[in-house]
Curated annotation (Swiss-Prot):
Designated name of the protein: Rhizobactin siderophore biosynthesis protein RhbF
GO molecular function: acid-amino acid ligase activity
Gene3D superfamilies (UniProt xref): 1.10.510.40, 3.30.310.280, 6.10.250.3370
Source organism: Rhizobium meliloti (strain 1021)
Family: Belongs to the IucA/IucC family.
BP GO annotations: rhizobactin 1021 biosynthetic process; siderophore biosynthetic process
Alphabetized UniProt keyword annotations: Plasmid
Pfam families: FhuF, IucA_IucC
Pathway the protein acts in: Siderophore biosynthesis; rhizobactin biosynthesis
Length: 601
């Protein structure tokens, strides 16, 4: 008779904790759906709101902020039953009841609830393991903090991870902090492509990753299958991807020797928030590995398009040259660009021939080598993803407040310093060079010393950098093969991209947290941001025309909606291209809104 031990994490499925995290996620669903105008919200009296959907009625308490965003009190959620109110705490039941009445297709509703359920399970595990105070969180490095953050704050299904089973979830997600060994394959040069910076080779990168002894054993295994480094490249692959995608879908190539399983490396890795990007914890200075995992998570399947994998290195080389030429970025800001130094892509012999095939089928086997943050840090420096600034410890103290105390600064002084470190390099890349970087909480890392913000690090270039469609001399030398892959869009879109990824997706949540927990009012928060931008612009009067082109001080900007993409515009369609964002109306620009309100008063 087979005996099974309880595989569930103790505490994660207790009724009390489940209700707690359920209420919190339901509050987030209501906040983000209201923000994206999935449904309307009526203010009955100051701080009290109501949702009316056909015969359904829900009530809650909330505070409204400058982006027309609500911060909902999870304990205040009630559903109207006749003449009485019943407590509301189940986000899955809420969505099952509400979404069909809003015109969401049944298939989409079912899949959305599935994805929301996965997110809720993850939230329960995070809550069950939570043990660190704000001060303890402030002492973590960037790798450890990846296990404490909770995914994109604006995506309600931020940890949907469709494709992972529960054992996969425990083994491969950042919040579970389970070290992973990377698998290595030999891949035929007839099917695989490798592009790296000029000084790098596939053999050299693999030696660095696994060591000389392990590299030699890989060569011996290749030789046993009739291959060598002349006929095959070596490629890292995620263990989940090998089991679920490579063996089933590339079986003929394995049988023919086009793909040769070489074994595991010795180093241990931990996943970042994207799940598929792995940080080396045995040797943190070694490259991080961005791998394919064909799971659906936060809008897309997490593969790597071949055209991007093979242009990442040329873009990195060009960006390094740009940084070296720009004294403001390199010397004054000390900006760190975590380069994608090499990329690989393996072509599937059948899927690649099908015109219009869903994109996931052509992004199953590839990788990128990216700089680790550790390799760029100076003595005494540490790093935290910007996403960490949206969190508080078990004692309720925000990480920002703990860092301010550690640095000997007030929260206001620390926040002003944060803006001076983060905003100028991001805006300078745009105004001076015509490049918009996606500086959201997972792509941007704050480098600190003794808790004080010092520098900024950016990553994820080939996927997220956008080039202005105007002919800027600063970007004229961008290689054509790179320009062909990057989005090239008008100036208005680029400025909205930065306003969205940094101001809405990071500072919107940070300002609410500090307003509620640390006594820094929202108007003061945005006043500090405004002052930082004006000081930067004053520093470069010769760029006045560029500042007019990329105007940060317009009255309003478009309201980006990512949850609506899942619910209405794309759903769970398996298309040949990735979904694009939706926009619904405009939001006030907080850099000018408070001045306008005070002047009007």
């Amino acid at each position: 008779m087979l005996m099974h031990h309880d595989p569930l994490l103790p505490g994660a499925f207790s009724e009390e904790l489940w209700q707690q995290v359920s209420k919190r996620l339901l509050a987030k669903v209501i906040e983000e759906f209201a923000y994206e105008r999935v449904f309307g919200v009526v203010e009955e009296k100051p701080g009290h709101y109501r949702i009316d959907i056909d015969e359904l009625q829900y009530r809650f308490k909330a505070k409204r902020y400058v982006f027309d965003n609500l911060s909902v009190d999870p304990a205040s959620l009630f559903k109207r039953h006749g003449n009485s109110d019943a407590p509301l705490h189940d986000p899955l039941a809420f969505c099952a009841e509400v979404l069909p009445k809003l015109g969401v297709k049944p298939m989409t509703v079912a899949h959305f609830i599935k994805e929301l359920g996965n997110t809720l399970v993850s939230d329960a595990h995070i809550a069950a393991r939570a043990s660190k105070t704000g001060a303890e969180l402030a002492e973590l490095d960037d790798i450890c903090m990846e296990g404490e953050t909770t995914g994109h704050p604006w995506v309600t299904v931020s940890k949907g991870r469709i494709g992972l089973g529960y054992s996969d979830y425990l083994a491969f997600t950042p919040e579970n902090r389970t070290p992973t060994e990377v698998l290595w394959l030999g891949v035929s040069k007839e099917r695989a492509s490798f592009i790296a910076e000029e000084t790098l080779t596939n053999e050299g990168l693999v030696r660095e990753a696994v060591g000389v002894s392990r590299f030699e054993s890989f060569c011996a295994k290749l030789a046993a299958r009739g291959g060598s480094v002349d006929t095959h490249y070596m490629m890292p692959v995620h263990p989940w991807q090998w089991d679920h995608m490579i063996v089933p879908h590339f079986a003929a190539d394995i049988a023919a020797g086009h793909i040769v399983f070489l074994g595991k490396g010795d180093d241990l890795y931990l996943p970042q928030q994207s799940v598929r990007t792995l940080s080396n914890i045995s040797h943190p200075e070694k490259s991080t590995l961005k791998l394919c995992m064909t799971i659906l998570n936060t809008a897309v399947y997490r593969g790597i398009p071949g055209k991007r994998a093979l242009t990442a290195a040329p873009l990195t080389t060009w960006l390094d040259q740009l940084l070296a030429r720009d004294q403001f970025l390199s010397e004054e800001c000390g900006l760190v660009l975590l380069g994608e130094r090499a990329g690989m892509h393996y072509v599937h012999p059948q899927f690649s021939t099908i015109e219009g095939a869903p994109y996931q089928f052509n992004e199953m086997l590839g990788c990128m080598w990216r700089d680790s943050l550790s390799a760029h840090l100076k003595s005494g420096e540490t790093g935290l993803p910007l996403a960490a600034l949206l969190h508080a410890g078990t004692d309720g103290k925000p990480v920002v407040q703990a860092l301010a105390e550690k640095s000997g600064m007030t929260v206001s002084e620390w926040t002003a310093r944060l803006f001076d470190v983060v905003i100028p390099p991001v805006f300078h890349l745009l105004a001076k060079h015509g490049l918009a970087f996606s500086a959201h909480g997972q792509n941007a890392t704050l480098i600190l010393k003794n808790g004080r913000p010092e520098r900024l690090a950016l990553r994820d270039f080939i996927d997220d950098v956008i080039v202005c469609d105007q002919a800027f001399p600063e970007s004229a030398t961008l290689p054509e093969e790179v320009r062909a892959v990057l989005l090239c869009l008008p100036a208005d879109f680029l400025i909205h991209f930065i306003q969205t990824t940094l101001f809405i997706c990071v500072f919107r949540y940070m300002s609410v947290l500090l307003d509620q927990r640390s006594g820094l009012p929202e108007h003061a928060f945005w006043g500090l941001a405004r002052s930082s931008i004006l000081a930067y612009q004053k520093r470069f009067p010769e760029m006045a025309s560029r500042f007019a082109t990329f105007d940060l001080f317009g009255d309003e900007y478009p309201r980006l909606c990512l949850n609506r993409v899942r619910l209405f515009t794309h759903g769970y369609a398996d298309d040949d291209e990735r979904p694009v964002p939706d926009f619904q109306g405009m939001v006030d620009n907080p850099l000018v809104a408070f001045d306008k309100r005070s002047n009007a008063a």
